Structures are given as structure tokens and as C-alpha cells.
Amino acid sequence: MKYKLLPCLLAIFLTGCDRTEVTLSFTPEMASFSNEFDFDPLRGPVKDFTQTLMDEQGEVTKRVSGTLSEEGCFDSLELLDLENNTVVALVLDANYYRDAQTLEKRVRLQGKCQLAELPSAGVSWETDDNGFVIKASSKQMQMEYRYDDQGYPLGKTTKSHDKTLSVSATPSTDPIKKLDYTAVTILNNQRVGNVKQSCEYDSHANPVDCQLIIVDEGVKPAIERVYTIKNTIDYY
């Protein structure tokens, strides 16, 4: 029996022997949409996904679902935020995302399928030469986004009137475990919160189960909340 293993063992060294090829980088669309719609970015040939955030009592507080084309464009995106009583459902139609219910044009796109403008809120987005959204602006605020060499979002800085809010994330040094990270939130040069996340990963280096710890340092004593994130992901 052991001799039958030799061809596969040899193939492991030469080609990987049917191992899933891991894509370590994030596409501009995935990284940028994750910033704007507040979900963990995913890698590889994702076909559809659902991320569910649950509190310590197991109650769902937020759910994000999306379907993507083979080119990596979001064909649809749905956000359910129970804490803020918000529901957003978008479907792709040419150069716009329409409201899935009313079919009203909500988001204008640029390039292949990247964010360009949210007319109803007066928000416009700017991209860098690689297609990543690096700025968002309106009359009331300015936002700047940061990414690492693999396209992983490293945080953002928001300026509105006399307030500056900065979120800075530090991911794991292991490129496979990119969604294991810590983050610090600073408001007007004063630290007001921190976050720590640790996950289990699938063969595409995407998180399937995560623990998220959020500490609100803006109150005394600080308040710690523990959440669980469940991901279901289908691939092409």
C-alpha cells in the first residue's frame, strides 16, 4: 500500500497533489466593499457567502450576505443590522446597484464594478491606481482608507467638523491568518476602544468561525463584549 502513495508524495513536491491553491491577496472590490459595508473581506474564487455576527447569548445582531461573479464583482449584497435597525439589499444592474425591492438606483459604479458614488447621501469615492477605494467624501465628512501589500484593509480615518476618528488594524504576521487581528480606535487623539479577533480557517485561508472581542474604553469602567462570527462560503 505504501508504494501507491509515492506518486502522490512526489506530486506534492512538484505540483501540490490536488491541494487547493491559496490566494493570499484581496481584490480591490472585496476589500473596498468590506470597508463600506463592515464585514470581513474574503479571498479566492468566492461564489457566495454569509457572515453572521452573534452576541454572547447567541442572538444574531448582524448578517451580511453576498453573491459574486467569477470576475469578483458583487452581483448582490444584503446587510441586516439589528442593533441599528438597518436593512440594505442591493442588486447589480450595469453601472449601478439598485435597491432589491424598489429597483431605485442606489450606488453608481466605476471601472469594472467598483464604488463611485452614493447620490442620495452626496458621497463619492476615489480609487488608487490598483482600483482600491482610498477616499470617500461628502459635504459633512472625509474618509481615508489604508491597505497592506496584499490588499488587506488596515483601517480608516474619518474627519467630520471638529472630530477625527481613526481605526488602525494590525493583522497576524501569518499571511494565512489575516483575519486574526487587533485594532485600536482613537477619537481626537484619545483612545476610546480596542478590538481583538481570532479565527479558524478553511482551505482558501478564509475565516469560518471567529471570536470577536470589542472593548469600549470611552466609558469607565471599560465594557467588554464578546461576539461570535459564523461564515458560510461557497466557491467556484
Curated annotation (Swiss-Prot):
Main localization of the protein described in the UniProt heading? membrane
Lipid anchor positions (N-palmitoyl cysteine): C17
> What is the protein's membrane topology class?
Lipid-anchor
Would you name any one GO CC term? plasma membrane
S-diacylglycerol cysteine lipid sites = C17
Q: Residues of the signal sequence?
A: 1-16
Q: Which InterPro entries match?
A: UPF0257
Q: What keywords is this UniProt entry annotated with?
A: Cell membrane, Lipoprotein, Membrane, Palmitate, Signal
Intracellular or extracellular location(s): Cell membrane
Q: Which family does it belong to?
A: Belongs to the UPF0257 family.
- In Swiss-Prot or TrEMBL terms, this protein is called UPF0257 lipoprotein YnfC
What is the native source organism of this protein?
A: Escherichia coli O17:K52:H18 (strain UMN026 / ExPEC)
What is the gene name? ynfC
